[in-house]
Amino acid sequence: MFVSKVIRNTVNKNIIFSRFLKERRKLYSCSTDKVTINSAISSNILQYSSDSPSKCWNCNFAYKSELFCSQCKTLQEMPENLNYFDILGIKLNYNVNNEEIHDKYRQLQRMLHPDKFGNRKEKEKQISESLSSLLNKAYSTLTHPLKRGLYMLQLKGISIPEGTTSVNPEFLMEIMERNEEVESALNDKEKVIRLMQENKIILHKLSKKVADAFSNNDTEQAKEVLMKMKYYTSIENKLKALKQDLGIID
């Protein structure tokens, strides 16, 4: 009787211990999955292009090209020497894929938006606000042909001052005539649409010339074409305003 009772107790303990081990394995598995997911986020999505090693401001863990410390998961500052192409993790090239830029921007902004850091440390909140603003600037610059070209010149230490007149007289005459056409289309929807289409074609051709110039490392040619793009972009903005005033819908 006593032996039977001991056996039953031993069996029950073994069953309980077995269940405990199963639960422990299950919890460990979940924990491992969580770490794997966090690592995937850190290594695949939340990275920028940099060769400079850094240390986490929160725990001093060494990391490289990661927005979140892989040790304590705290948001990190970006190195100051990064350009907009580095920030979005794309190759420095005038020819870009706007869809790729948009996807990367959305992924990063979704993780870096200040609303995500309401309950975090004050420094982390400030970093979030700074990075989110920087990301907006990078996106608006690289998705705009003129801004992208001017920014690439800026990276080479070249700028085009506002109000520059270093363009040939024939081109200035051409721009004056275009502006007169815009002025004469104030109440003419069809003319506004036609002028917008023509201007779009001109800007597209100029953009291709800029791409060729940068591809050939000809910054003087790129600068000359970008100056022309500035004038035609100004005309484009006037036509867009007219289009809105006249209630023209695409």
What would you call each of these model-derived segments?
Residues 2-250:
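C-terminal accessory/regulatory regions appended to core domains
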